[in-house]
């Protein structure tokens, strides 16, 4: 099914389709978050506007893709068995996940505590994680080795954020920025752990497509929306602190 083959006028949502419900809820949350981040962008200092723009892009791009993913699922569910929108989901992740990882760099860059090399290391690790995941889930490579590679890349990102240059840079920032950075690191550690769990449940002969998609949808809402809210919190706290010093 191509992107152009589905629309908001497609298959109806079945009341027993909990996966479909999770797709619809995720779509609504992504749209609401995007509107909020765009409006709040005008209330933060200039140095934070790029970070707020990226937060809005993450949820905005996700909203666009979810409008198609939910219809893909509903249409296939109506035909007898829900089909996971694998390609659409990974296209979304290929755009939004590197943007999320870049937020760590942007937050530190906003207060002058980041280097370009940090950005490229985080960006590269996120691509390795995504490419390995897609190759494994699509059957183009062995599932478990690809899961191991993806998890290794994720653990490297966690290391950079919790113990590497990103952590060292965050320690020199304001209290509000440090709090937001730590909260984002928790989301990266705990929230992103949902993805390999979903991946694992969707592999093998007894693959649970329903559980995989529900977990992926929950993870996307938590990680994209909550992640953006932490950026917003850091921006507003730093803006207030700067205003009080003037």
Language-model region placement:
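Hydrophobic transmembrane alpha-helical segments in integral membrane proteins
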Residues: 3-30
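Short aromatic-rich membrane-water interface segments that cap or initiate transmembrane helices
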Residues: 13-18, 80-94, 213-218
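Hydrophobic alpha-helical transmembrane segments of multi-pass membrane proteins
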Residues: 29, 51-71, 191-200
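Alpha-helical transmembrane segments in multipass membrane proteins, preferentially the mid-helix core
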Residues: 32-36, 103, 132, 153-175, ...
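Internal transmembrane alpha-helix with an interfacial aromatic "cap," most often the third helix
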Residues: 34-38, 70, 90-123, 130, ...
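Membrane-interfacial loop-to-transmembrane alpha-helix junctions, especially the N-terminal start
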Residues: 46-55, 114-120, 181-184
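Helix-loop junctions on the outward
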Residues: 62-89, 131-140
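C-terminal transmembrane-bundle signature of multipass membrane proteins
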Residues: 160-163, 183-246
């Amino acid at each position: 099914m191509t992107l152009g083959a589905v629309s908001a006028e497609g298959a109806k949502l079945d009341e027993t389709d909990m996966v479909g419900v999770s797709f619809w809820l995720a779509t609504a949350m992504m749209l609401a978050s995007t509107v909020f981040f765009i409006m709040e962008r005008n209330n933060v200092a200039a140095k934070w506007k790029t970070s707020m723009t990226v937060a809005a892009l993450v949820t905005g791009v996700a909203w666009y893709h979810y409008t198609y993913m939910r219809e893909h699922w509903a249409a296939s569910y109506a035909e007898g068995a829900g089909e996971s929108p694998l390609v659409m989901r990974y296209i979304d992740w290929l755009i939004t996940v590197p943007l999320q990882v870049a937020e760590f760099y942007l937050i530190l860059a906003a207060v002058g505590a980041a280097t370009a090399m940090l950005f490229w290391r985080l960006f590269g690790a996120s691509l390795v994680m995504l490419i390995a995941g897609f190759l494994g889930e699509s059957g183009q490579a062995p599932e478990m080795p690809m899961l191991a590679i993806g998890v290794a890349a994720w653990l490297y990102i966690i290391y950079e954020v919790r113990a590497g240059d990103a952590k060292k840079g965050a320690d020199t920032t304001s209290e509000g920025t440090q709090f937001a950075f730590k909260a984002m690191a928790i989301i990266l550690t705990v929230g992103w752990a949902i993805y390999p769990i979903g991946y694992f449940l969707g592999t093998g002969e007894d693959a649970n497509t329903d559980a995989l998609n529900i977990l992926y949808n929950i993870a996307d809402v938590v990680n994209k929306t909550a992640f953006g809210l932490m950026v917003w919190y850091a921006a507003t706290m730093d803006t207030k602190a700067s205003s009080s010093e003037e």
